[in-house]
């Protein structure tokens, strides 16, 4: 990277070279190793802070991404299969959201409408709006090839999709991705990993 500085902005004081930079020049230096998120393709990786994310999709509505590693491990889904009641949802849209918002700006995290339709097609739980969520089972199917086939994950990880719902006398079973990348379901009291799913403003600058 090359920055042109007017000689008038360079001085020597006590044997030290002093360079006066304007805000644009300073910004160029600070962002020298960053790229605009919109330039990345599905499967590309980038960093927010010390966390690595994978680009899943670029669209007019934002850039959908997922954490490469588990942000949390051994997390219980909750007391039932309704994502709206899950302590993981509270965690992601509380402490975790605050951490990411400090790094990218709150206005650059785009709210998502989450479909809580069960694996067997029941809509008891409706929808909800989240700043940060988990993939649904259908979203996992959509992005499976991007995330990788025959993956070997260190643990199982949750989706937001219930296996069925109370109208079918099932209220405790939730879909998860197994360590072999196959979709299964288990009781909501089990402990699995958490991979945050976000929709970001494509114009933000990110590190590779």
Question: Across the structure, where does each feature detected by a protein language model lie?
Answer:
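Collagenous Gly-X-Y triple-helix signature in extracellular proteins
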Residues: 2-208
């Amino acid at each position: 990277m090359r920055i042109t500085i007017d000689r008038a902005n360079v001085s020597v004081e006590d044997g030290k070279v002093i360079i006066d930079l304007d805000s644009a020049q300073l910004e160029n230096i600070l962002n020298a190793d960053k790229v605009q998120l919109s330039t990345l393709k599905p499967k590309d990786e980038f960093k927010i802070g010390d966390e690595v994310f994978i680009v899943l999709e670029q669209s007019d509505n934002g850039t959908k991404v997922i954490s490469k590693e588990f942000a949390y491990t051994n997390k219980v889904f909750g007391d039932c299969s309704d994502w709206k009641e899950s302590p993981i949802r509270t965690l992601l849209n509380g402490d975790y959201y605050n951490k990411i918002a400090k790094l990218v700006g709150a206005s650059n995290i785009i709210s998502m409408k989450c479909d809580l339709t069960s694996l067997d097609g029941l809509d008891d739980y409706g929808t909800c709006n989240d700043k940060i969520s988990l993939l649904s089972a259908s979203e996992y199917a959509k992005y499976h090839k991007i995330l990788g086939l025959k993956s070997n994950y260190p643990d199982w990880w949750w989706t937001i999709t219930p296996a069925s719902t109370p109208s079918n006398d099932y209220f405790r079973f939730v879909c998860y991705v197994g360590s072999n990348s196959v979709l299964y379901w288990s009781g909501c009291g089990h402990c699995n990993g958490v991979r945050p799913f976000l929709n970001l403003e494509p114009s933000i600058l990110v590190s590779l």
